[in-house]
Design a protein with these regions (language model features):
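Formylglycine-dependent sulfatase
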Residues: 1-396, 404-425, 438-439, 454-492
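A contiguous binding-surface segment within folded domains or other stable secondary-structure elements
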Residues: 399
Length: 492
């Protein structure tokens, strides 16, 4: 049987600003062509909208509170994946698969992510990336070993200048500079329409078009090497666009992202089922290892969607996803969790008394400067009041059919108490199953106090206590049942 290879292409800070996702402004012919040849997912979700954390979920099949990559990778602060985690590169190597990574890595330590072949770089030169892939393919041609190659692009991430996206950096002459006019840009609903936002979106679109050319270059090299006929191609992004209301938030603009998969010999289709980034590694293992993947997948939170890849109907078993964010930068502590169904989204903001923190690149942006200095009152980011962006309540509940921008919080709505209680319970059950240290009762981590549960002691729910009137007996609130931790089984 021919080797079953994988080419995993990961963009940096890319939302759905692509032609194949209905954006009429940004020119992305190569990505659009890939979508026309494969499956375009409309409901693919990152677990966290932060670079290192999101990439770690892709490469481990575990949420960040499970794998330890709580925030941006940093040896100085030891913000790294737990040493005991077996990542995709390690699991694949056990089965003789050649693994490689080109470009942005941004996870660690190296011992946990033992890619056999590395060409690490933050270059914007997508031709360079394609040539490194060519070298990798040539090595695979010589010995015939199956491979899983990951390419981490740096586009369309911001650069270190105000409003810049790396468009002035030197690149190969084969890369065309695709310019956009700010006055022509399409401002997404999650952003405010300001001159600074338009200027940055035009620069952002140029970086996306450069990324698109890189996708074309590398797919050509795959074809020339003769591997296109037996390689599963996966195109995705780590998190949403680097703007407020998106990156570092768990609102849909930050976590509902492009995912395109081309399976050899299959027709194009659109899949509307809800899949999570923790499902990517199980799917890769399924494709690359076949039956041998069963043992490796047992330790993962995700599940393979290979069998439902071409499903055009909404399936009951694929109707929700969970998400987990704790840090972005090491000083950006704001732990929050979510569950999203087809219609509703529930956020549990664990450290809700803290102001929502800024990522450095977003704080220095022209978009934020325009919003901060705007004369309108109240100030807004898109449809959201600025104060509601900074100061968030313990819980948020949104009806996405009627409120896709997640602005009108229904937590106190009498008509939505049943769905609130259901989603609250499902989220907490998931936190228990995944051993989440940030599941709290009265300010105490349940996981860290598991010995109390094991001893038969009751751990009260903070929702049983009226913090403004602690003398009140909340006997009308049923006690939450003590579930065991780490239950293996279905996502729900």
């Amino acid at each position: 049987m021919a080797a079953r290879n994988v080419l995993l292409l990961v963009a940096d800070d890319l939302g759905k600003q692509l032609g194949c996702y209905g954006n009429p402004y940004t020119k992305t012919p190569n990505i659009d062509k890939l979508a026309s040849e494969g499956v375009r997912f409309d409901n693919a979700f990152a677990s966290t909208a932060s670079c290192s954390g999101s990439r770690s979920t892709i490469y481990t099949g575990l949420h960040t509170h499970q794998n330890g990559q709580y925030g941006l990778n940093s040896g100085k602060h030891h913000f790294m994946t737990f040493d005991h985690i077996e990542s995709g590169p390690a699991l694949l190597a056990k089965n003789g698969v050649r693994t490689g990574i080109i470009g942005k890595v941004h996870v660690g330590p190296d011992a946990v992510y033992p890619w056999e072949w590395r060409a690490e770089s933050l270059t914007r030169d997508v031709w360079w990336s394609a040539q490194r892939a060519k070298e990798f393919f040539e090595a695979s041609q010589k010995d015939g070993r199956p491979f899983v190659l990951t390419v981490g692009y740096h586009d369309p991430h911001r650069d270190r200048t105000r409003g810049g996206f790396g468009n002035d950096e030197p690149v190969d002459d084969r890369i065309q500079s695709v310019k956009y006019r700010p006055e022509d840009t399409v401002v997404p609903e999650f952003l405010s329409d300001t001159p600074g936002a338009r200027q940055e979106l035009a620069e952002y679109a140029e970086a996306i078009s450069r990324l698109d050319q890189g996708i074309g270059f590398i797919l050509k090299e795959l074809e020339v090497a003769g591997f296109a006929k037996d390689t599963l191609v996966i195109f995705m992004s780590d998190n949403g666009p680097p703007f407020m209301n998106s990156k570092t938030t768990l609102y849909d603009a930050g976590v509902r992202l492009p995912l395109i998969i081309r399976q050899p010999g299959s027709k194009s289709s659109v899949n509307t089922n809800l899949v999570s980034y923790v499902d990517i590694l199980p799917t890769i293992l399924d494709w690359a290892l076949g039956q041998a993947s069963q043992e490796a997948k047992k330790q993962l939170s995700g599940r393979s969607f290979l069998q439902v890849l071409h499903e055009v109907k909404d399936l009951a078993d694929w109707d929700h996803v969970f998400g987990s964010h704790t840090f972005h930068e090491s000083t950006n502590y704001w732990p929050t969790r979510f569950i999203r169904t087809r219609r509703y989204k529930y956020h549990r903001n664990i450290a809700w008394r803290l102001d929502f923190p800024f990522a450095n690149d977003i704080y220095g942006s022209l978009t934020w400067e325009d919003i901060r200095n705007a004369e309108e009152s109240p100030k807004k980011i898109g449809q959201r009041k600025l104060k509601d962006y900074f100061f968030r309540p313990p819980e948020e509940l949104y009806d996405l059919d009627n409120d896709p921008q997640e602005v009108t919080n229904l937590v106190k709505s009498p008509d939505h108490q049943e769905i609130l209680e259901e989603l609250r319970g499902r989220l907490e059950d998931w936190q228990r199953r995944t051993n989440d240290p940030w599941l709290y009762r009265d300010g105490i981590s349940i996981l860290l106090n598991k010995h109390h549960l094991d001893a038969g002691l009751e751990v009260p729910d903070k929702w049983d206590l009226d913090i403004e009137h602690p003398e009140t007996n909340r006997g009308d609130v049923p006690k939450y049942k003590n579930l065991p931790f780490g239950i293996a089984g279905a996502r729900d």
